[in-house]
Design a protein with these regions (language model features):
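Core AdoMet radical
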Residues: 1-60, 69-72, 98-103
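Mobile, glycine- and charge-enriched loop segments
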Residues: 1-2, 9-12, 57-76, 128-144, ...
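Alpha-helical scaffolding segments of alpha/beta enzyme cores, especially the outer helices
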Residues: 3, 20-27, 55-65, 87-94, ...
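Active-site glycine- and acidic-residue-rich loops that bind
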Residues: 13-18, 52, 75-90
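Residue-level marker for beta-strand->alpha-helix junctions and adjacent short loops that shape enzyme
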Residues: 17, 40-42, 77, 107, ...
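Alpha-helix N-cap and loop-to-helix initiation/capping positions
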Residues: 48-55, 80-87, 115-123
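Short, flexible active-site loops
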Residues: 68-77, 85, 106-116
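Auxiliary Fe-S-binding modules of radical SAM enzymes
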Residues: 90-191
Length: 191
């Protein structure tokens, strides 16, 4: 497919990877590797126990070392504090990631986070603004859960969001390309 569509930018998301495995992906035409930090180093043990925060950081460093762009962010609403979100932003800045997906938890019954209280939309907008301040040149992407913002979703574009993942996600529904295009143009931006 890469041979037929030279302008298509390919992104892979395969979890923890060695530099050698990432090089094979790059050789196959991948230009970006997606690997979320998920949360801050401090809060991470509350989110994942199968591997460490450093395992995730090392995968990102390996991807950058071989010349891949990196997409890495986290999920807001796991029980973290605003300080945790800010700490993650500074880690992402230090890692020089190219793109930060902003995910908002959608509690799913039967999961460890099913009873988490929703993060208020204004808290998410404040976080987006802080991320834009910390990472002024990084793509901040709306990702999973942005429908939780309701009528505030457009405001996120004014707070610092400058790209979006559209369509459905792994466990939740998203929005359509047409709705996203309309949202952007209604605010006076060009696509």
């Amino acid at each position: 497919m890469r041979e037929r569509t030279k302008k298509l930018s390919l992104c892979a998301s395969h979890g923890i990877c060695t530099k050698e495995a990432l090089q094979k992906l790059a050789n196959a035409g991948i230009s970006m590797y997606h690997h979320n930090l998920e949360t801050s180093r401090r809060f991470y043990p509350n989110v994942c126990t199968s591997h460490t925060y450093d395992d995730r950081v090392n995968t990102i460093k390996n991807a950058k070392a071989i010349g891949l762009n990196v997409c890495s962010g986290g999920i807001f609403g796991l029980g973290e504090t605003i300080e945790d979100r800010i700490d993650m932003a500074f880690d992402l800045k230090e890692l020089k990631v190219n793109s930060v997906p902003i995910n908002i938890l959608t509690p799913i019954p039967g999961t460890p986070f099913e009873n988490n209280k929703a993060v208020e939309p204004l808290e998410i907008l404040k976080t987006i603004s802080i991320y834009r301040f910390i990472m002024p040149k990084t793509h901040l992407r709306y990702a999973g859960g942005r429908i939780k913002l309701g009528n505030y979703v457009k405001t996120g574009l004014k707070c610092g969001i400058n790209s979006a993942l559209t369509g459905n996600f792994l466990t939740t529904t998203g929005t359509t390309i047409e709705k996203d295009k309309n949202m952007v143009t209604e605010l006076g931006y060009k696509i």
